[in-house]
Structure formats: structure tokens, C-alpha cells
UniProtKB/Swiss-Prot annotation:
Protein name (database record): Probable transcriptional regulatory protein tll0175
UniProt family annotation: Belongs to the TACO1 family.
Keywords: Cytoplasm, DNA-binding, Transcription, Transcription regulation
One example of a Gene Ontology biological process annotation: regulation of DNA-templated transcription
SUPFAM superfamilies: YebC-like
Source domain of life: Bacteria
InterPro entries, alphabetized: Integrase-like_N, TACO1_YebC-like_2nd/3rd_dom, TACO1_YebC_N, Transcrip_reg_TACO1-like, Transcrip_reg_TACO1-like_dom3, YebC-like
Gene Ontology cellular component list: cytosol
Organism: Thermosynechococcus vestitus (strain NIES-2133 / IAM M-273 / BP-1)
Subcellular location: Cytoplasm
Length: 250
């Protein structure tokens, strides 16, 4: 009986992992479609597409799936309803601002899903522009953490950027979005391994949450939004102490 129970738990866990993997594949495939549509199907001349393909390969998406997504983006392969990129904005618990980027073939469905997620946690989906002014969009280049910070600074100066943050095993370099390709290539030329490139919405000011109930609802809303099929990214202006964050996952 114990053995059967263990096997049932393993099956449930595998189903969750498979479902999550499917969502990641769909999200990355959509990013490839949009990149190919906007900049053409040649990765050599389309940095956004090249970056999307690299992320897809890193996630284990088969090459034929990648080629199919490119073909859909360029119009050489018939596809379903066209995808469009839409930005949604709203307020979560505690007045936390949410900026959400979606790729959808049905904006009414996506808006309804978002509205339900916000309402469940006591937030509300707002009008375009209600929180967008609180964020700035930056390019982020993630590299392996440098052993010599002085040499790293020299590489950053060569790339004409100054803002960076060294985390545990990586460093994040901030630059204007149009400079992502140049900064990435310059860092590679200086011997740094580029792990990721992306555009990211960064809050100009933050809202600190100090009580557990509000923090829990904010995190639940973030999880709910990120798990929606159409959502590509979720940015917020929330901040909370490490102790409070740890308490949420006990």
C-alpha cells in the first residue's frame, strides 16, 4: 500500500512538471513567432530572434519545433489566429503595481483570465497607463559571476555601461534595450559567458510589504499570473524583507 501511495505521488509530481514544461515550451515558442514576425526569420540579422532561439534550445525545445515557430512568424507556414503582444497593468494587494506582458491570440480571454486572478487576491486589473509610468524598461545581460571585479569593470566600460549587480553565481548588467546585442557581444569578446539577455521592466520606486497576509496574497497573485498560458513576464514594484519572504515558504 505504501508503495502504491509513493507511486501515485511520483505520478502527480511528474504531471505537474510535464504541465509546467509544456507551458514553458509554449511561452518560448510564442516569443520566437513574434521575434520572427517583427525582424525576419534569419537569426544572424535578428538579435531578438537569436536570443529567443537560444532560450528555447536551453529549455530543450526540439529543433523542428523552433523551425516551425520561425515559419509561423514569417508567414511561410499556416498558423492559427495571429498572436499579438499586449501589456496589461493593475494593482495587487497592498497597492503593489503589476505590469504584465502577454502574447495572445484572444485578448478577451486573456483579459478575463487576468481579471479573475487579480480579483481572487483582492487586486484589480486597471486601464492601460495606470502603473506603466512607475516602471522603466531596461536591457539585462546576465553573465557568469566575474572572478576579478576590476577586469569586469573594464569590460563594462568597453561596452559603455556602468550599472551592474553581482549576485551569488551571476552578474546582471543593465543597459538600454537597443544596446543589448552590442553589450552582449562586447562581454563575450572580453571572455565572459553570457547566460541570458532580456528586456525587463524595473520599478523606479518600490512598495514595501511588512505583514504576512498581504505578502502571501501578493506572491499568490504573482504565481497565478505567471502560470497563465498567455503571459510572458510579470513585473511588480513590491519589496519585502528576507525574513518575511522565507516565512511565506515555510
Amino acid at each position: 500500500m505504501a508503495g502504491h501511495s509513493k507511486w501515485a505521488n511520483i505520478k502527480r509530481q511528474k504531471a505537474r512538471v510535464d504541465a509546467q514544461k509544456g507551458k514553458i515550451f509554449a511561452r518560448l515558442s510564442r516569443a520566437i513567432i513574434i521575434a520572427a514576425r517583427h525582424g525576419g526569420g534569419d537569426p544572424a540579422g535578428n538579435f531578438q530572434l537569436r536570443s529567443a532561439i537560444e532560450k528555447a534550445k536551453a529549455a530543450g525545445i526540439p529543433s523542428e519545433n523552433i523551425e516551425r515557430a520561425i515559419a509561423k512568424g514569417t508567414g511561410t507556414l499556416d498558423s492559427d489566429a495571429p498572436l499579438e503582444a499586449i501589456r496589461y497593468e493593475g494593482y495587487g494587494p497592498g497597492g503593489v503595481a503589476f505590469l504584465i506582458e502577454a502574447l495572445t491570440d484572444n485578448r478577451n480571454r486573456t483579459a478575463a483570465d487576468l481579471r479573475a486572478a487579480f480579483n481572487k487576491q483582492g487586486g484589480n486589473l486597471g486601464e492601460t497607463g495606470c502603473v506603466g509610468w512607475m516602471f522603466e524598461q531596461w536591457g539585462i545581460v546576465t553573465v557568469t559571476a566575474p572572478r576579478d571585479e576590476e577586469a569586469f569593470l573594464e569590460a563594462l566600460l568597453a561596452a559603455d555601461v556602468e550599472t551592474y549587480e553581482i549576485l551569488e553565481e551571476v552578474a546582471e548588467v543593465r543597459c538600454p534595450v537597443p544596446a543589448l546585442e552590442t553589450v552582449s557581444e562586447t562581454l563575450k569578446e572580453h571572455g565572459y559567458t553570457v547566460l541570458d539577455t532580456e528586456s525587463r521592466w524595473i520599478p523606479m520606486n518600490t512598495v514595501e510589504i511588512t505583514d504576512e497576509d498581504t505578502a502571501r496574497r501578493v506572491l499568490k497573485l504573482m504565481d497565478a499570473l505567471e502560470n497563465l498560458d498567455d503571459i510572458q513576464s510579470v513585473a511588480t514594484n513590491v519589496t519585502m524583507s528576507d525574513a518575511l519572504m522565507e516565512a511565506m515558504y515555510v
